[in-house]
């Protein structure tokens, strides 16, 4: 049993929740009017929202500090817009928007009928990169962690795994923390049981390695290593 690693579980049914018209969001960390002392940002990971947007609906947000924003479609695709660009990103891709303090972006559901679901992640950085990125991955290739984001400070991965497949992630910097989010299915991560949309924050990681096992077929795991 790993007794060195410090861990905090973020249960799906204990997340913050907000609904505004056609927009619904579940917050793993404090966001908007939702505040809980135990849900402060995890190092440079400021926000991880599980968002749904009805057909034709849109919303906009503004960042208060230099921020890398990851838009990860889970169901359907989405349109996004900043002062510099306007484009579409679909499932199997991640769009990274690098914004300076005070900059805004918009997200829109372009479909006439279908609801979309996506994960929205904010990562703070000392200086804005101001260079948007697009990352693609193929979850049809199972039992592999695909890089979905990489900077000098943070790195993210996603993968789909067969049931009972076990694996590990060697962290890049032992001073960093790792946040794990289960997109679908069930996993055991560092001997902690996680269900769909649960999160797990890990620090002081034993042996500088994250061990995990998928406990259901086609389980999808999101893993982000961040500066603390």
Segments from the language model and where they lie:
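Hydrophobic transmembrane alpha-helices and immediately adjacent juxtamembrane helices
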Residues: 1-10
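Ligand-binding loop in jelly-roll beta-barrel domains
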Residues: 84-86, 99-129, 152, 204-228
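Structural motif
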Residues: 77, 184-186, 218
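Short beta-strand segments
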Residues: 48-49, 73, 122, 183
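Conserved, well-structured core segments that form or line functional sites
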Residues: 113-189, 196
């Amino acid at each position: 049993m790993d007794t060195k690693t410090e861990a905090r579980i973020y249960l799906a049914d204990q997340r913050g929740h907000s609904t505004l018209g056609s927009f619904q969001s579940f917050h793993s960390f404090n966001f908007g009017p939702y505040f809980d002392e135990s849900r402060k940002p995890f190092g440079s990971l400021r926000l991880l929202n599980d968002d749904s947007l009805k057909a034709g609906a849109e919303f906009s947000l503004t960042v208060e500090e230099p921020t890398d924003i990851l838009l990860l479609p889970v169901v359907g695709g989405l349109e996004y817009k900043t002062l510099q660009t306007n484009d579409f990103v679909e499932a199997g891709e991640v769009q990274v928007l690098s914004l300076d303090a005070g900059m805004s972006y918009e997200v829109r559901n372009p479909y006439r009928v279908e609801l979309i679901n996506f994960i929205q992640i904010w990562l703070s950085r000392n200086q804005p990169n101001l260079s948007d990125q697009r990352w693609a991955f193929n979850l049809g290739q199972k039992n592999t962690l695909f890089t979905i984001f990489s900077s000098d400070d943070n790195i993210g991965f996603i993968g789909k795994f067969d049931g009972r497949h076990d694996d590990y992630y060697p962290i890049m910097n032992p001073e960093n923390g790792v946040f794990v989010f289960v997109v679908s299915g069930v996993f055991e991560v560092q001997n902690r049981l996680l269900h769909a949309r649960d999160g797990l924050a890990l620090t002081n990681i034993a042996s500088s390695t994250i061990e995990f096992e998928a406990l259901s077929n086609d389980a999808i795991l999101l893993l982000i290593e961040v500066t603390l």
